[in-house]
């Protein structure tokens, strides 16, 4: 989600330069992207392994280095909530004195039409209809309001008043200063702004290390996402002191080691005198001074070797993982994410996303409720069959992988059915959502293993059911020999009756229609909402078409 305007680019570059950051502007150009918003393009051919952005961690913005870091720490606020509150204070109360304000002011919580950037879970009811019935709605329930964000707003408002009462700290105007006179209306307006801040920062945050956690990184957030072939990798040393951010030994680690030694000493026979077992503050300070001298020498050597470049462990880098040709847009990646996750967290969608799926859980439930003949089979599947089939199928896939590619791949299976088994373990065997969530079609139009299995099960004749999976036929259904004999039948993909059942189910599936007059009637939908909804819905329509062709 690009929420940086073209006019802001010079401010960002100036901020990075003032922080002694290094951006290869001789090789890279920030300009408008065909994908929308801004992007970063290669001015010349750039080789794999080159770092095109290097920033000291002191120049990024996190809750841990913000103007209210101590207050957040004392209040035990961390994670994204801490970053959201810190951003609000930094851009309002401390804007005139903040080191980061020249950068933070370029992060917009409104689009180019002036509308707040809101996640679909907080769209107005008529706009939510744009995604009704899609996987966004039925599988992930992402149209339901997120209670965590609303609770976060309550916490932020309470803290703002507490800090104001105790320290005289100004309450951020326009964000956390909820009016008592017109409470409900003003509360809702401020809540929406808080949600927009949270959504915007979520789309731009990078995981830095144990100290900074998620932070805002200038320039790094301007690179657009590529689904399958990103050009960049984000490099940052994560294992640092979570109290001060030091990558090497610090007073906190010294104290921890001392406590560990003291605890160990308590369990040892008491043969030494107290003088040999007690460490005092003077000794700790002496050790710290020795460490500082040693660190200064190491830093000096690094600067001599690297021409003045700072300690790499204290920097973040964007490094090319492949060659980039002149004129090519340089892409980052937010991960292997479907449009559902991209829209829910980052505010954009990608046409023909290879990680999209179409969820069929509610569609199966419709036919299961209509047909009495399916009830015994569904009961068996939900209570016993799905768990057995998932475990058996995963084992078969693992054996196939080992036979084809050796033992190495057995530890890194990527088949969808394994995730089914993991979710089964997490949610419990009796969870209705557990097996319904595994009924889907992938982006290529291929039904999931559980979808084929349930379709094959439902189309069994009475005689087949009695002989294969009924209680009479399988008194010891959990026996592995029985599983190996019976369960392979459910994995078949050439059963004409199953194909017909699936074809009918897909033809009856209802997805939103976002064309012409239909979308124009939704007055609360912004241009961005309509565009993202169209992309997501069209992707699901395309998947259904591919699947129908496979089944025909």
From Swiss-Prot:
Coiled coil: none annotated. Residues 26-335 form the SET domain. GO terms for molecular function: protein-lysine N-methyltransferase activity. InterPro entries: SET_dom, SET_dom_sf, SETD3_SETD6_MTase. Keywords: Methyltransferase, Nucleus, S-adenosyl-L-methionine, Transferase. GO terms for cellular component: cytosol; nucleus. S-adenosyl-L-methionine binds at residue 334. It is found in: Nucleus. GO terms for biological process: methylation. Its main location: nucleus. Residues 413-432 have a biased composition (Acidic residues). Residues 399-432 are annotated as: Disordered. Disulfide bonds: none annotated. Its EC number is 2.1.1.-. Present with 7880 molecules/cell in log phase SD medium. S-adenosyl-L-methionine-dependent protein-lysine N-methyltransferase that monomethylates 60S ribosomal protein L42 (RPL42A and RPL42B) at 'Lys-40'. Belongs to the class V-like SAM-binding methyltransferase superfamily. This is Ribosomal lysine N-methyltransferase 3. It comes from Saccharomyces cerevisiae (strain ATCC 204508 / S288c) (Baker's yeast).
């Amino acid at each position: 989600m690009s929420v940086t305007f073209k006019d802001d680019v010079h401010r960002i570059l100036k901020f990075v330069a003032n922080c002694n950051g290094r951006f290869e502007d001789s090789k890279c150009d920030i300009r408008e992207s065909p994908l929308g918003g801004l992007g970063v393009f290669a001015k010349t051919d750039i080789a794999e392994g080159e770092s095109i952005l290097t920033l000291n961690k002191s120049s990024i913005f996190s809750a841990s280095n913000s103007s209210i870091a101590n207050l957040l720490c004392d209040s035990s606020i961390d994670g994204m909530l801490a970053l959201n509150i810190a951003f609000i204070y930094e851009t309002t109360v401390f804007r005139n004195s903040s080191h980061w304000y020249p950068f933070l002011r370029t992060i917009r919580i409104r689009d180019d039409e002036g509308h707040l950037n809101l996640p679909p879970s907080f769209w107005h009811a008529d706009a939510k209809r744009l995604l009704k019935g899609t996987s966004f709605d039925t599988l992930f329930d992402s149209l339901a309001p997120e209670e965590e964000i609303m609770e976060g707003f309550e916490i932020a408002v309470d803290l703002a008043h507490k800090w104001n009462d105790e320290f005289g700290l100004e309450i951020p105007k326009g964000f956390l200063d909820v009016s008592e006179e017109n409470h409900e209306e003003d509360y809702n307006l401020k809540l929406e702004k808080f949600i927009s801040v949270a959504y915007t920062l979520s789309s731009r945050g990078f995981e830095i290390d144990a100290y900074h956690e998620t932070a805002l990184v200038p320039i790094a957030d301007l690179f657009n996402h590529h689904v399958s072939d990103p050009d960049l990798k984000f490099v940052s040393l994560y294992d640092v002191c979570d109290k001060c951010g030091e990558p090497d030994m610090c007073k906190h680690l010294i104290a921890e080691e001392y406590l560990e030694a003291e605890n160990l000493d308590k369990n040892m026979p008491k043969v030494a005198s107290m003088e040999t077992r007690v460490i005092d503050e003077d000794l700790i300070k002496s050790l710290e001074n020795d460490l500082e001298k040693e660190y200064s020498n190491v830093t000096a050597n690094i600067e001599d070797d690297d021409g003045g470049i700072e300690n790499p462990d204290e920097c973040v880098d964007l490094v090319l993982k492949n060659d980039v040709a002149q004129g090519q847009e340089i892409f980052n990646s937010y991960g292997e994410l479907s449009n559902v996750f991209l829209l829910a967290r980052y505010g954009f969608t990608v046409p023909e996303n290879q990680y999209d799926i179409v969820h069929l859980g509610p569609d199966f439930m419709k036919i299961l409720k209509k047909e009495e003949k399916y009830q015994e089979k569904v009961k068996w599947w939900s209570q016993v069959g799905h768990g057995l089939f998932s475990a058996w199928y995963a084992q078969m896939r693992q054996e196939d992988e080992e036979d084809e590619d050796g033992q190495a791949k057995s530890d890194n299976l990527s088949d969808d059915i394994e995730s089914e088994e993991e979710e089964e373990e997490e949610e419990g065997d009796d969870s209705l959502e557990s097996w319904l969530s595994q009924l889907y079609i992938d982006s290529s139009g291929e039904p999931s293993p559980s979808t084929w299995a349930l379709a094959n099960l439902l189309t069994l004749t009475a005689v087949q059911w009695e002989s294969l999976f009924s209680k009479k036929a399988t008194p010891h259904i959990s026996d592995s020999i029985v599983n190996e004999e019976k369960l392979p039948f459910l994995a078949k993909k050439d059963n004409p009756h199953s194909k017909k059942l699936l074809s009918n189910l897909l033809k009856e599936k209802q997805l939103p229609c976002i064309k012409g007059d239909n979308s124009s009637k939704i007055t609360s939908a912004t241009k961005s909402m309509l565009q993202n909804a169209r992309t997501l819905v069209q992707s699901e329509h395309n998947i259904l078409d591919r699947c129908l062709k496979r089944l025909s």
